[in-house]
Amino acid sequence: AVIVNGKTQTAGTAQTATNSSGQTTTTVTVDTSKLENILASQGTGATVTIPITGNSYVAAGTLTGAMVKSMESKNATLVVQTHSGTYTLPASEININAVSQQLGTSVALSDIKVTVSISEPSASMTKVVETAAQDGGFTIMVPAVDYTITCAHGSQTVNVSSFNAYVERTIAIPDGVDPTKITTGVVVDPNGTTHH
């Protein structure tokens, strides 16, 4: 299911796969024509939420580049929501036209697979986070969460990580963690640089 402006719609299908390491990935693929019809009736500024249930290692929402472009033209906001957090961004921040140029001018937007995912960080990134915490003198109260946006066509992939507007990432505070002990959230770049 996909939620548009707070109303649940049947416009997505979920699939869970397990890799050789036993890590599960749950992917919700949005039905382009169904979502297009729903958005046409909503006007501009709609919020499209892709809720992903379960405790998968990776939770991802997938749309076509054409759907992202359509959402962009309608000033829509995309939200991927999981048990560990949410990723909220205006569709325009994916900048699908620039991505398309990087993938090749002959690539149709409908052939570009846009994936917004929330996952546990890799072992190497977890080590980077732990080192950054040690160097910065802060304590990790909640497990780190990795947020990524990729756009792919065939074997080519473009990572989207720079934005011109505010992009919201939230982390759920697990049971047993005292929220009064949490001062701030910190972004840790792959090189170990931290930002508040």
Q: Residue ranges of each PLM-predicted region?
A:
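Surface-exposed loop/edge segments in extracytoplasmic proteins
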Residues: 191-196
